Structure formats: structure tokens, C-alpha cells
Amino acid sequence: MAVDAADRREVIVKIDGENGNNNGVSGETVGKIWRDGSYDFWTDGEGNLNKGHNAAAVDSDRSAATTGEQQKDEGFEFRRGEDPPTKLIGQFLHKQQASGEICLDMDLGMDELQSRGLTPVSESPRVSTKRDPVGRRDSRSNTNNNDDGEVVKCSGNNAPIQRSSSTLLKMRTRSRLSDPPTPQLPPQTADMKSGRIPKSGQMKSGFFGKSPKTQGEEEEDDPFAAEDLPEEYRKDKLSLWIVLEWLSLILIIAGFVCTLAIPSLRKKKLWELQLWKWESMVLVLICGRLVSSWIVKIVVFFIERNFLLRKRVLYFVYGVRKAVQNCLWLGLVLLAWHFLFDEKVAKAANTKALRVVTKIFVCLLVGFLLWLVKTLLVKVLASSFHMSTYFDRIQESLFTQYVIETLSGPPLIEIQKNEEEEERISVEVKKFQNPGGVEIQSGAQKSPMKTGKSPFLSHVLSNGGGGGGENKGITIDSLHKLNPKNVSAWKMKRLMNIIRNGSLTTLDEQLQDPSLDDDKGNQIRSEFEAKLAARKIFHNVAKPGSKFIYANDIMRFLPDDEALKTLSLFEGASETNRISKSSLKNWVVNAFRERRALALTLNDTKTAVNRLHKMVNIVVGIIILVIWLIILGITSTKFLVVMSSQVVVVAFIFGNMCKIVFESIIYLFVIHPFDVGDRCEIDGVQMVVEEMNILTTVFLRFDNQKVVYPNSLLWTKSIGNYYRSPDMGDGIEFSIHITTPAEKIILIKQRITSYIEGKKDHWYPAPMIVFKDMESLNSVRIAVWPTHRMNHQDMGEKWARRSQLVEEIAKICRELDIEYRLYPLDINVRNLPTSTALPVSDRLPPNWSAPASGSN
């Protein structure tokens, strides 16, 4: 059959449940079938299409010449013979046709099913079914009589690629401060019962990592004695290089002793230098690094004995000990080289070679010294910056984490008191049961414990599983003792790792398999999950049927001092001594937001410090290279002139960039006006900090538009930070008529004040209400200036509270019959001018007809 290559038509697959007759395919269109995917239509063994209740018929477009001709039923297929996935899909289609179902899911990401060179028609990867009674485009005639059949439009597998690209685009443009998609609520959430505790098994959680101490063991008062030093520094690592150094030390010392003991070897000279001096030089060169490590360990040992030095200096000593070790080693080599080679030997030997070797040793020593100073400065500046900026926020966040997990678990304090009471009663019973009146010492007698402490409360805050070294957890008692003055650099680094790598979790009262480490179900990863956690905590802590959580309820879970501190964290709880559901929900949601923003801030700060470290490495490397050239004498006057001219050109090109980089670094690490998640106001526009970099800062505007500001530009602008502001005020203004009675005005003030003082968790008492201004001698503007018990970081909550206050003011005005009215105005008519004095016009609109001359 002749095939027209230029004729590209469309094939429509129709599923007809009533008519099993199949129309043939025109010979002119067999050679060029337009399709959008790789489909395998089920045929029988002879190539004909299967006929049944749901037979697939192919209705192709025909040209005007083929009018009314019906060809024989011929089956056709476009099949990939060697394609197993396509074959499986064909079998699946056949089974669905046999069962009467039409439900195809082509959301497969297989490369074998990609139709190359064809563009997808629909973005949806699923097969859609709809009726198409009308002819498709390019259809000149349609000979199929079954136009009411269902048309299955099969889209190819390029659609998943297009959808995945759009998904990646959404992931790339999604804000880091936004929540993941909110899941649907479970049909029934099992609330926790506070009165039960499992009899056995292990309760695991995401941030109670390591096992607590034994119940009888008391914690040390000094939390810095052992846990400040990471595990990697407590044990010496035995490497191959150290083994070779020890073997070389033993062999060289043995050779050195033999040389000095044997007279012939002692007098032997090599290159006008005695043999034992050469051996000493080799000993210092090979084993000097080992000796320098001993010196460093001795210094570290004496520093560890001093409490103040251990907290402040030891971190930096361990941080630069490799550089110090290398400097000591090269210093020993340079001293040995200088004193072993005297002037006679230098004259007898090649003087130029000795000088070059000496200069090389000096260059290496200077390079290591500069690198040591650079490393020490970067570590000191980074540590002091983190301590002064983030310590308070980290401590508060970890305490919040501890409170959330403790309140979501069993009531440990109540359980401990019940056990102590049962133990006391059992002792009394045994005392009365003893006929002689002699007290029997029993192993079950209560062991002495510190007041206010609980063996259950030796909680360990961790980043999800404990571990050693920098990931080791920290006890809550140690956290309370920390402050910016006594916290060590290692402790600060560990706290930062807990925040960066951990997350808020809840401790569900359920038994978990100790062999499983699946705590992700209890992690709070969105505001929706934070609200669910707040609901669980409320049902776990509050008494059955109660609408509030009282101080006594919290004291069942926490010691008295921690319970009072926890109570002060909630809005209005300090005055009422109770916590409502809304305040608990807001507190947990705000705790999640704060934890997320703090983790992002620490991540951005770490990235900025690492990039700054790389920049400093480049600068110090260039300085070391220039110093080496000067020491080695490679530079000459001509070379310096050429280099100076190049430096001038580079300074002209990159001078402004260097200035911008320097200003950005000072702005980010010294001024530091904001952190990630802070709501700021720049040029009258409120924005939230999305990301901090060395050169730029990314903000999110109120409509979620990302705005990138260069830090050098922010240097010149005034920035208002809502997050760092104290509790902020607000203002509401309204106008009343000047004739409003004074009694009503006094009543308005009293009712507004009573409403604000009744909302103790939202407003401070005694708002200021003043007559602000007078308008047109007929109205008075009254201003109400209350003060929120929050700053305006959460702008949505601020407007919600203000809206409630405005609604209350409107309600008060309506109840007091104070409404907006236009009072009558006095109009004095003195004298009306005569009609002759008024201007008279004979002009009429164009569609009006002029009156007759005789009409009045």
C-alpha cells in the first residue's frame, strides 16, 4: 500500500461496550500513526484485535475519496517486541478490559517507556476517559456510526518528566520557613492517658537519646569535668605514621648510641661532619614531630588541671594543636640545622646549597606560624560570635524541647511520689508485723535521694539518638547551670549540633520495640503537627473534663521550680495560674517556629563562617607565597616593579569588590541586625528574613515574593527588627460627634478599659485613651493606645487581637447609641434676588423641540 509520509493524522481509541464491529484502518494512514506514548494494544495470535464485550476499535480519519467504503476487520498493533514493561502494561490492559474496568495509571518513570522525539499532549500522566461526540481536528469525514462511545486519550510517559520538573521547580522556589503539605487528620487520634505507665519495655524518643544514670548515682556539680572533651581527643589514635616514627626513633637512637660507644665510628666523618651529628639531624627530622606531640600533650595536661583554662583555652588548644605541633617540629629542625653545621663545615661544604636548605626551613616555619595564627583567630572569633549571639536562644529552645517531651510522657513526679508512699507504707507494715518491735533492715528500703530530684528526670537532651563526641547529649540539670560566662566552646558546639540536627518531638506513652529506631512518627515537622502535639499534651496533662491546665497538673510531670518556670512561658498563665487550650496551642506552634528559625540561622551562620574561612585561607596563602619569595630571594627589583603594576591594576578592578566583601563581613558578623525568621521593616516594607549569606540576604515580602538585598546596601539603611523588639503597642482611632454627652464618653472609656483588662493574656492593663484631635468643629477623634503582651513578629496574631478590640469598640458604640449621623444644618435665607437679575438662557438640548411661538 502506498503510504503518504506527509499525511500525519490522529488515531482515536474508542471503547464501545455494545458494538463489537471494528472499522478498518485506511491504507493511507497506516504508515504514519500519530501517538503520544508507547502503548501495546492487545491482539490475538493472528494479529486481529480481540472482540468481546469491551472490544477496542480503531477509527482513523479518511480522505474525501474513501466515502462509505468498509474494509475488512484487520488488527494492527504498535508494539515494542523486546520491551518487557510494555508487555506487562499490555497484559494489565487486557485484564482490565476483561473485567470491565477502565482505570489506567501511566505514572511510571521508566526510561524504556519514554517516547523519544514526541511531545506530550497532556501534563497529566493518567489516562483520561471522556465522551467526544464531535469530530477531532483535521477530520474531514467520519464513517464510524458509534459516535457516542467513550474515547480513551492515552498520554505518553513524557508527562511524568514534565510534572517532575514542575515539582522540582516548586521545591526550589518553596520557602524554607513554609510548612510541608498538611496531611489529613486521622479518623481517630488516640489521646494519651496520663495515669498509666507501661510495666516494661523501653520508651524511646527523638531527643532523649542516651540512657540516664543509675538511680542511686548522684550527678557531679561540675558538668565540665569529662563531657567537655570529645571522645576523639580522649584516646590517642594509633596510625601507621606514628608506628613508623616510633620504629625510626628506636633504630636511630640505637645507631646513635653505637656511634658514640665505638671509637672508630665516633671519629668517622661524612662531608666534613661527624657521623653522630648526621644521625642527630636525621633523628630530629624524622622523629621531631613525635617529640613535638609529647610537648603539646604535656601543655594540654597542665591546662586540663586548671578549671578556668580547661573551660576557656582547651578548645582552642586542641583546635590548633596540629599547627602548634608542626611549628615545634620545624623549630627543632631549624635549631638542629643551625647548631650542628658550624662555620668550618659551611666553608668546606657547598655554602650555597646549605643556605638554600636553611631558607627552605625558615619558609616552612614562617608559613606554619602564619597558618597557626589564622586558625586560632578564626576559631576564637567564631566561638565568641556564637556564644554572644545564640547562647540564650539555644538554652531557651532546649528547655522548651525538654518541657514538650516531658509533658507528653507519663507523670514521673506523681509516679515517684506514689512509689515513695507505697514504700513508706510497706516499711510501716513490716514494723508493726515485727513482734519484738525491732526494725528489720530490708534491701527494698528507700535509698536517700536529693530533694526535688527524680531518678526519672535525668533526661538527656540529644539530637536524636545520643552518641558520643560532639553529638553526645546534655542533661537538663547541666543546661540550667550553663551561662555565657561558664559555657565552654565544646559545650557550645554540642548545643549548636543538637539544635541544627535535632527537632521537636513528643514522647508518646506507648511501648516500642527496643530493636527499632523509628522515632520519626513523634517528630514535629510542621505547624499542623505542632497543633496535634498540643492537643495530645493537653489531654495528657489536664484532668478529665477540665478546660484548663493548672499548676498542680504540671507539677505531676515536673519539679516545682521547673513547673513554675514552665507556667511563666504561657500567655496570661502567671496571673491566672492556668493554661488554656489556645495558649498551649500557640506556645507549641511558636516553639516549633522558633526552633526551625534557629536551626536555619545556625546552618546559615556555619556556611558563612566556612566561606569566610576559605576566603581567609586564600588571603593568607597569598601572603605566605609573597613572604617565601622574599626569603628565598627570588624577587628582584624588576620583578617587584612588574608585580606592583599588576597589583595596581587588580586593585583598580577588584578594589570596590573587596570593599563590598569587607563591609558585608562586618555587617553580618559584627553588626548582625537580624537572624533567619526575623520580621524586619526596610524602607517601610515588612519582610521576613529567608536566608543569610556573606554578600546577600534573601527576604520574603508579605506576598511571599523573594527580595534579595546586598549586605553592602543594607549597611546604609535603617532596619526595624520586630523579633528583637519588646512587647509593642498599638493604636486604634475613632470619631464621635462633638455633641455626644460626657457620660457616654466616660462609659465608653470604662468599657474599653474593662475589656482590655479582661484579656490579660493579650493586653497589658490600663490602656491610654485620649482625645487626640478635633475635626471640622463637629467631631472629636478618640485614640486608644493599648500594649500587646507580644511583639509584632507574628503579624497575623497581632491583627487578630486588634480586630477583636475594634469589634468590641464598635459593639460598645452601638449599645450606647453612638452612630454616624448627619446632624441638621441651619441655613439662613436672607433675600432672594429678582428674576431680572438672574441670567436667562434660551439654549435647549439638541433632542428637545423648541416650543411653539404661541405656547406659554
UniProtKB/Swiss-Prot annotation:
Q: What spans are recorded as compositionally biased (Acidic residues)?
A: 217-226
One cellular-component annotation, GO: plant-type vacuole
Record field: compositional bias (Basic and acidic residues): 70-85, 129-140
Q: Which controlled-vocabulary keywords does the entry list?
A: Ion channel, Ion transport, Membrane, Phosphoprotein, Transmembrane, Transmembrane helix, Transport
* Localization: Membrane
Q: Which residues carry this modification: Phosphoserine?
A: S211, S462
Q: Where is this region: Disordered?
A: 45-86, 116-226
Q: Transmembrane residues, as ranges?
A: 242-262, 283-303, 323-343, 360-380, 615-635, 651-671
Task: Please give the Gene3D superfamilies that the UniProt record associates with this protein.
Answer: 2.30.30.60
Q: What is the annotated signal peptide range for this record?
A: none
Start-end of Polar residues biased regions: 155-168
Q: How does it sit in the membrane?
A: Multi-pass membrane protein
**GO biological-process terms attached to the record:** monoatomic ion transmembrane transport
Please name the PANTHER family in this protein's record: EF-HAND DOMAIN-CONTAINING PROTEIN, MECHANOSENSITIVE ION CHANNEL PROTEIN 5
Question: Which family does the UniProt entry place this protein in?
Answer: Belongs to the MscS (TC 1.A.23) family.
Q: What does this protein do?
A: Mechanosensitive channel that opens in response to stretch forces in the membrane lipid bilayer.
Q: What is this protein called?
A: Mechanosensitive ion channel protein 6
Identify the species of origin.
Arabidopsis thaliana (Mouse-ear cress)
